[in-house]
């Protein structure tokens, strides 16, 4: 494919990239949750701790506080200690989960920015699409920026238009 033919399909390339980035942005929370589940195996330990606490509470309900106060108090302290340990564990896991989601989000937005910058760099002086200049007469210079081609649609304007159209189309799915 020649350079001229590649430039002819530039509008579709940019639209595809914008569409893909917006779809990925919608799927980002699900992907982050999946990755955090894959990277964290602590939920099994937490469920085991919850089961132990439940068993101890069950045992505590069978102990008479008046007759066996020492055993009752010891079991109650053990339950409190295990509950505190579980709370600490859950807080640590939640903090790690937030960190994983933040890293994935930042990585996505950095890649998206790099992609958009590379598209702007590639099509800076070439119009993404050329339309009859009378279609965009009052705004022709603004729409053509930075190409300065009469009737041309510049990359920055095209990215803005694509983002708006894709956002409207994908709104029901987000």
Swiss-Prot record:
<feature type="topological domain" description="Lumenal">
    <location>
        <begin position="1"/>
        <end position="8"/>
    </location>
</feature>
<feature type="transmembrane region" description="Helical">
    <location>
        <begin position="100"/>
        <end position="120"/>
    </location>
</feature>
<dbReference type="GO" id="GO:0071816">
    <property type="term" value="P:tail-anchored membrane protein insertion into ER membrane"/>
</dbReference>
<keyword id="KW-0812">Transmembrane</keyword>
<dbReference type="GO" id="GO:0045048">
    <property type="term" value="P:protein insertion into ER membrane"/>
</dbReference>
<dbReference type="GO" id="GO:0050808">
    <property type="term" value="P:synapse organization"/>
</dbReference>
<dbReference type="InterPro" id="IPR029012">
    <property type="entry name" value="Helix_hairpin_bin_sf"/>
</dbReference>
<feature type="transmembrane region" description="Helical">
    <location>
        <begin position="9"/>
        <end position="29"/>
    </location>
</feature>
<dbReference type="GO" id="GO:0043529">
    <property type="term" value="C:GET complex"/>
</dbReference>
<feature type="region of interest" description="Interaction with GET3/TRC40">
    <location>
        <begin position="39"/>
        <end position="97"/>
    </location>
</feature>
<keyword id="KW-0256">Endoplasmic reticulum</keyword>
<feature type="topological domain" description="Lumenal">
    <location>
        <begin position="121"/>
        <end position="148"/>
    </location>
</feature>
<comment type="similarity">
    <text>Belongs to the WRB/GET1 family.</text>
</comment>
<feature type="coiled-coil region">
    <location>
        <begin position="39"/>
        <end position="94"/>
    </location>
</feature>
<feature type="transmembrane region" description="Helical">
    <location>
        <begin position="149"/>
        <end position="169"/>
    </location>
</feature>
<comment type="subunit">
    <text>Component of the Golgi to ER traffic (GET) complex, which is composed of GET1/WRB, CAMLG/GET2 and GET3/TRC40. Within the complex, GET1 and CAMLG form a heterotetramer which is stabilized by phosphatidylinositol binding and which binds to the GET3 homodimer. Interacts with CAMLG (via C-terminus). GET3 shows a higher affinity for CAMLG than for GET1.</text>
</comment>
<keyword id="KW-0175">Coiled coil</keyword>
<protein>
    <recommendedName>
        <fullName>Guided entry of tail-anchored proteins factor 1</fullName>
    </recommendedName>
</protein>
<keyword id="KW-1133">Transmembrane helix</keyword>
<dbReference type="Pfam" id="PF04420">
    <property type="entry name" value="CHD5"/>
</dbReference>
<dbReference type="GO" id="GO:0005789">
    <property type="term" value="C:endoplasmic reticulum membrane"/>
</dbReference>
<feature type="topological domain" description="Cytoplasmic">
    <location>
        <begin position="170"/>
        <end position="174"/>
    </location>
</feature>
<dbReference type="GO" id="GO:0071599">
    <property type="term" value="P:otic vesicle development"/>
</dbReference>
<feature type="topological domain" description="Cytoplasmic">
    <location>
        <begin position="30"/>
        <end position="99"/>
    </location>
</feature>
<dbReference type="GO" id="GO:0006620">
    <property type="term" value="P:post-translational protein targeting to endoplasmic reticulum membrane"/>
</dbReference>
<dbReference type="GO" id="GO:0005634">
    <property type="term" value="C:nucleus"/>
</dbReference>
<keyword id="KW-0472">Membrane</keyword>
<comment type="function">
    <text>Required for the post-translational delivery of tail-anchored (TA) proteins to the endoplasmic reticulum (ER). Together with CAMLG/GET2, acts as a membrane receptor for soluble GET3/TRC40, which recognizes and selectively binds the transmembrane domain of TA proteins in the cytosol. Required to ensure correct topology and ER insertion of CAMLG.</text>
</comment>
<dbReference type="GO" id="GO:0007605">
    <property type="term" value="P:sensory perception of sound"/>
</dbReference>
<dbReference type="GO" id="GO:0043495">
    <property type="term" value="F:protein-membrane adaptor activity"/>
</dbReference>
<dbReference type="InterPro" id="IPR028945">
    <property type="entry name" value="Get1"/>
</dbReference>
<dbReference type="GO" id="GO:0051649">
    <property type="term" value="P:establishment of localization in cell"/>
</dbReference>
<dbReference type="GO" id="GO:0050821">
    <property type="term" value="P:protein stabilization"/>
</dbReference>
